[in-house]
Amino acid sequence: MVLLSKFDFSGKELGKFELPDAFFTEGREQSVKDYLVAIQANKRQWSACTRGRSEVSHSTKKPFRQKGTGNARQGCLAAPQFRGGGIVFGPKPKFDQHIRINKKERRAAIRLLLAQKIQTGKLIVAENSVFVSSLDAPKTKEALRFLKECNVECRGVLFVDSLAHVGSNENLRLSVRNLSAVRGFTYGENISGYDIAAARNIVVSEKALELLVESLVSTTKD
């Protein structure tokens, strides 16, 4: 069992968060790579479309006579060598090219990414009160002070909370969104593995981490 320190808004350690050993079971790094590639590939619209010589709108009249001009013979203005002509080997919308990742692979990849952050000391656990009741109004200065008190490197920080705190965490969300050190504010129930991989440091609420461990560890037992 792994113990993680829990911090309050003043940066004081108030206890430990217990992580089961099953959370750190070995997994395939290839699954992480496949998952991240799928996320990026599926952002594409796959809608690029060009017109070939048979699709462009042009007269079928021969540009000039076959012989006597000294030019190479031409038969149609829709040919690709003419301005406004068709495109050769241009992109076309093909079949559905979205990459599908099943739930088990997705959860395994997210678990491995989180385990790496924990093992390298890039994830800290904040008490639920930090997200819910620490601020009575949005205060960017106080949010920055919290990061410094917890010895969090102020670079690429990702805040992760639970959807159960939506609304009550609005003051903290508004406080951190204007910090250049903060990468984003998301929720554990719909977190993306790409956000975890791209973040340098993660500040997660106790409630969000409980939900993540429950969903990810139960998957490893199946």
From Swiss-Prot:
User: Which Pfam families does the record match to this protein?
Assistant: Ribosomal_L4
Ranges in a coiled coil: none
One GO CC annotation: ribonucleoprotein complex
Write down the NCBIfam families for this protein, in alphabetical order: rplD_bact (TIGR03953)
Q: Which domain of life is it from?
A: Bacteria
Q: What does this protein do?
A: One of the primary rRNA binding proteins, this protein initially binds near the 5'-end of the 23S rRNA. It is important during the early stages of 50S assembly. It makes multiple contacts with different domains of the 23S rRNA in the assembled 50S subunit and ribosome. Forms part of the polypeptide exit tunnel.
Source organism per UniProt: Chlamydia trachomatis serovar L2 (strain ATCC VR-902B / DSM 19102 / 434/Bu)
Name of this chain's protein: Large ribosomal subunit protein uL4
The subunit structure is: Part of the 50S ribosomal subunit.
Record key words, sorted: Ribonucleoprotein, Ribosomal protein, RNA-binding, rRNA-binding
In the record, biological process GO terms are:
translation
Lineage, please? Bacteria, Pseudomonadati, Chlamydiota, Chlamydiia, Chlamydiales
Q: Of which family is this protein a member?
A: Belongs to the universal ribosomal protein uL4 family.
Q: Name one GO molecular function term.
A: structural constituent of ribosome
